Curated annotation (Swiss-Prot):
Disulfide bonds: none annotated. Coiled coil: none annotated. It comes from Mycoplasmopsis synoviae (strain 53). Belongs to the bacterial ribosomal protein bL17 family. GO terms for cellular component: cytosolic large ribosomal subunit. This is Large ribosomal subunit protein bL17. GO terms for biological process: translation. It holds the Pfam family Ribosomal_L17. Part of the 50S ribosomal subunit. Contacts protein L32. SUPFAM superfamilies: Prokaryotic ribosomal protein L17. Keywords: Ribonucleoprotein, Ribosomal protein. One of its GO terms (molecular function) is structural constituent of ribosome.
Length: 120
């Protein structure tokens, strides 16, 4: 498979915006359905963000704040608070592999390979 960042034929602003949205939605909902290529790229961003959040430092909090969308959870907590207070402590003893990708059947309209990515 080719380099996922080159597949979209879009500029870096578009790619970064899509990745920010997908990672934010993944952390908010715990699982999302997207194309296989996007899921593989989201996995890297999400895992690095969770690993940095485990450090619980001011620098990691600022890095996450610059990347995540300003979404609010059901408990009226921001996504940043959810990441540092709930998600990161859950993976404290886990050295990596915080996400799992399931391959789904191809999409009807254009036969694109689909996948479900979820937090373990």
């Amino acid at each position: 498979m080719a380099n996922p960042t080159q597949i979209y034929s879009r500029d870096s602003k578009w790619r970064r915006g899509v990745m920010r949205s997908l990672v934010s939605e993944l952390l908010l909902h715990g699982r999302i359905q997207t194309t296989l290529t996007r899921a593989k790229e989201v996995r890297g961003h999400a895992e690095k963000l969770i690993t940095k959040a485990k450090a619980q430092s001011l620098a990691s909090r600022r890095h996450a704040a610059s990347f995540l969308r300003p979404l609010v959870t059901k408990d009226n907590k921001t996504l940043l608070q959810e990441l540092f207070d709930t998600i990161a402590p859950k993976y404290k003893d886990r050295p990596g592999g915080y996400t799992r990708i399931y391959k789904l059947p191809k999409r009807d309209g254009d036969s694109t390979r689909m996948a479900l990515i979820e937090l373990v």
